[in-house]
């Protein structure tokens, strides 16, 4: 029997992941089945975090618009996810957390089953997802004060924090030897952009700071590669039909 608890967020998150892979559930209406090596696919090869690229990765990058559909985030008046203590993301000071997953602490667990958070685990590995590392003092003012479409071509590597000497913001154009290194106060040296990016000159890592989790095989022993993945895709479930009907009734 599967474990589920209304008060245990980890159990709810794991239960939903298990549901994605339960091809024998009596709720299933339409399941697309695969079998390695004859009828395999490459979903993990195209969408897994960058540390597993075989040879591709990060093809599906969930956006903030998608995450805003889930309850539990602190929000601005316009409904967008709050990242500063100001009235919008361009003023005030950045909110600080003890870990990258802190911003997701109160979010409904099903989002965690859909996407991989920075600092969360997949296939038994901690996913070191970060665009850069800031070494300046706190509080931290927003790097941009205008996030409108008109200024969308301005990048973080054009900000004063990155261009000044000594710089306060470290970012990497690519993985491997292209990584900028940051030495922490305790003497530890880390990669500025982690193992999974985003990297500002490599589009194969996530472009949004989030990776998809749904249907990625969590088994560390499973194969990753084009034509090597064999997990089934549950295209329709009975519960989904009921929820769609309820949503349609509300929206009519």
Positions of PLM-derived features:
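Extended, hydrophobic/aromatic-rich amphipathic alpha-helical segments that build helical scaffolds
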Residues: 1, 30, 107, 111-116, ...
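An aromatic- and glycine-enriched ligand-binding surface/loop that stacks and positions planar moieties
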Residues: 1-180
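Active-site beta-strand/loop architecture of penicillin-binding DD-peptidases
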Residues: 183, 187-237
């Amino acid at each position: 029997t599967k474990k589920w608890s209304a008060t245990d967020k980890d159990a709810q998150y794991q239960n939903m992941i298990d549901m994605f892979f339960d091809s024998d559930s009596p709720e299933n209406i339409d399941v697309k089945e695969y079998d390695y090596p004859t009828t395999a696919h490459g979903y993990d090869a195209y969408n897994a975090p960058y540390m597993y690229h075989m040879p591709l990765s990060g093809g599906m990058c969930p956006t903030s618009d998608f995450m805003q559909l889930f309850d539990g985030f602190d929000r601005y008046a316009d409904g967008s996810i709050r990242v500063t203590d100001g009235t919008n993301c361009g003023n005030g000071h950045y909110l600080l957390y003890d870990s990258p997953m802190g911003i997701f602490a109160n979010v409904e667990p099903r989002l965690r089953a859909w996407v991989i958070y920075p600092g969360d685990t997949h296939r038994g590995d901690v996913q070191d997802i970060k665009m850069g590392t800031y070494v300046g003092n706190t509080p931290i003012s927003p790097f941009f004060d205008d996030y409108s479409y008109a200024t969308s071509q301005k990048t973080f590597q054009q900000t004063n924090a990155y261009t000044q000497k000594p710089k306060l913001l470290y970012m990497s154009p690519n993985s491997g030897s292209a990584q900028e290194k940051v030495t922490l106060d305790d003497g530890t040296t880390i990669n500025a952009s982690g193992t999974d990016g985003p990297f500002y000159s490599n589009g194969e890592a996530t472009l949004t700071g989030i990776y998809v989790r749904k249907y990625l095989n969590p088994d560390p022993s499973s194969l990753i590669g084009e034509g090597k993945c064999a997990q089934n895709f549950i295209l329709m479930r009975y519960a989904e039909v009921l929820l769609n009907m309820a949503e349609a009734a509300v929206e009519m």
